[in-house]
Amino acid sequence: MNQTDTSPIRLRRSWNTSEIEALFDEHAGRIDPRIYTDEDLYQLELERVFARSWLLLGHETQIRKPGDYITTYMGEDPVVVVRQKDASIAVFLNQCRHRGMRICRADAGNAKAFTCSYHGWAYDTAGNLVNVPYEAESFACLNKKEWSPLKARVETYKGLIFANWDENAVDLDTYLGEAKFYMDHMLDRTEAGTEAIPGVQKWVIPCNWKFAAEQFCSDMYHAGTTSHLSGILAGLPEDLEMADLAPPTVGKQYRASWGGHGSGFYVGDPNLMLAIMGPKVTSYWTEGPASEKAAERLGSVERGSKLMVEHMTVFPTCSFLPGINTVRTWHPRGPNEVEVWAFTVVDADAPDDIKEEFRRQTLRTFSAGGVFEQDDGENWVEIQHILRGHKARSRPFNAEMSMDQTVDNDPVYPGRISNNVYSEEAARGLYAHWLRMMTSPDWDALKATR
């Protein structure tokens, strides 16, 4: 692998609205590669995308008891996520108001309070400033109520925790919209819901966050060609040969009517899932009591047991693979780097051996050292490396696949649906919403585009 210089490419001081609008042409299917490299665009993303979107922070079962906490990020802003005594969840900026040091330096734990290690300012688990050393002697006029860290809005959807800095943003339910229908394929297969397998894997990829978000949103194309041949070969059951594993062709792709979310899935053919997750997980997902229960809850046998190798992104950076059950956030680290935080969910009432098999197979396939994850990372890193070149950034990328092949009135699947699983309709939706957020000054303007 070529070594990638992750220093930003600074080409200009600012972008005006018309220049940003020209970066993506949905009707022609053209993407300006500068959206993946420009530092000024990235700084605007932090302000207009990451500070105004609902961002995935974790799973409720990672903070079960009062005082349980995890630390994570919203964009590049560090945050603390804490279970409260009343079972609610608080999220606040992990930054002391005195000189800006982290309030909490651990990844996870249980606490009754958080104390800044620099000067000792202390905060309760809701993020309120409660103690200042030498307050009487040195801070006689300090009003502690005015010096708490910034607090985010928090909402959950079927176990997943989301937060948003913007008070004027739509609520999470509205933000997700019909995407909830597709999220339920993983999150609502049983009345017990899901639980997170302990542990979060974290690794850095020197590429722009949008490459990862787009692939999980829209790109079944690479899975049906040559990208993952080595991983498929490694995971084939003994009674299957590569010749028996023709790439599936039957499936659908979903594009959110508004919001940038997207998903895609094969229908009916289990062979690729067998190669990825093995016979035990595939059988659990497609036949027997668990799949029958899922079919009943989800309203159809197809949704409960026939959807294979599904991929999904909730805009901008929440991605997961139902059936494989990896869930991850793509934390941006500049225009040329992303930090991946991934965990695995399972049906809470699944047998222990099934939970263990999900854990084992996800580690083998989609983890920092996973055989499929390595293929994806290699491609993204090499693309980012090539985009260091002036000429490489000067010619648009093609996003025309399956253009004009969507319907808005599918009898089963909501949103804009492509009946060709090999489509870039969801990618066009992701970039259209990215453009919408980058050119809208506030949520009032965004709401007007719905």
UniProtKB/Swiss-Prot annotation:
GO MF annotation, one: toluene dioxygenase activity
Enzyme Commission numbers on file: 1.14.12.3, 1.14.12.11
Residues annotated as domain Rieske: 54-163
SUPFAM superfamilies named in the record: Bet v1-like, ISP domain
InterPro entries per UniProt: RHO_NdoB-like_C, Rieske_2Fe-2S, Rieske_2Fe-2S_sf, Ring-hydroxy_dOase_2Fe2S_BS, Ring_hydroxy_dOase_asu_C_dom, Rng_hydr_dOase-A
Pfam families, A to Z: Rieske, Ring_hydroxyl_A
Reactions listed under catalytic activity: benzene + NADH + O2 + H(+) = cis-1,2-dihydrobenzene-1,2-diol + NAD(+); toluene + NADH + O2 + H(+) = (1S,2R)-3-methylcyclohexa-3,5-diene-1,2-diol + NAD(+)
Residue positions binding [2Fe-2S] cluster: 96, 98, 116, 119
Residues where Fe cation binds: 222, 228
Binding note for cofactor: Binds 1 [2Fe-2S] cluster per subunit.
Keywords recorded for this protein, A-Z: 2Fe-2S, Aromatic hydrocarbons catabolism, Dioxygenase, Iron, Iron-sulfur, Metal-binding, NAD, Oxidoreductase
Organism, scientific name: Pseudomonas putida (strain ATCC 700007 / DSM 6899 / JCM 31910 / BCRC 17059 / LMG 24140 / F1)
The protein's name in its UniProt record: Benzene 1,2-dioxygenase subunit alpha
Cofactor or coenzyme needed: [2Fe-2S] cluster; Fe cation
GO process annotations (BP): toluene catabolic process; xylene catabolic process
Leader sequence residues: none
Keyword Oxidoreductase: yes
Gene name tied to this protein: bnzA
Family recorded in the similarity comment: Belongs to the bacterial ring-hydroxylating dioxygenase alpha subunit family.
Functional pathway: Aromatic compound metabolism; benzene degradation; catechol from benzene: step 1/2; Xenobiotic degradation; toluene degradation; Xenobiotic degradation; xylene degradation
Highest taxon listed in the record's lineage: Bacteria
Role summary: Catalyzes both the oxidation of benzene and toluene.
Subunit: This dioxygenase system consists of four proteins: the two subunits of the hydroxylase component (BnzA and BnzB), a ferredoxin (BnzC) and a ferredoxin reductase (BnzD).
